[in-house]
């Protein structure tokens, strides 16, 4: 990979992680382009994934048996082709979808 792509991807990862923290989105430790978002309940992960897909974002839910019960998560895959504005749109959509899914969960 060309150095400018690596540098851009590193900036996008840092931007995503910082923005997620600012929005209260719980991330698992990862310095790679794969950013796991801890959700917990499988239904909540699936509902959030579907809400994001309806908004044009492909963020798959990773559920048992791939991960232990109660440890469902979302899988964000960043690439150097993404722009910061797209990462911001994703973060806003994530925060909104998570809030909506949590409301319907109760």
Q: What are these model-predicted stretches?
A:
Residues 1-58:
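Conserved PLP-dependent catalytic core of the aminotransferase class-I/II
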Residues 54-58, 65-106:
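PLP-dependent enzyme catalytic core of the Aspartate aminotransferase-like
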């Amino acid at each position: 990979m060309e150095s400018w792509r690596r540098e851009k991807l590193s900036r996008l990862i840092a931007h995503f992680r910082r923005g997620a923290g600012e929005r209260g989105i719980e991330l698992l430790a990862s310095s790679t382009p794969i950013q796991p978002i801890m959700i917990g309940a499988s239904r909540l992960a699936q509902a959030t994934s579907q809400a994001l897909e309806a908004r044009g974002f492909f963020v798959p839910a990773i559920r048992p048996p791939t991960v232990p019960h109660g440890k469902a998560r979302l899988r964000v895959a960043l690439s150097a082709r993404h722009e910061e504005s797209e990462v911001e749109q994703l973060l806003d959509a994530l925060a909104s979808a998570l809030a909506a899914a949590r409301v319907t969960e109760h």
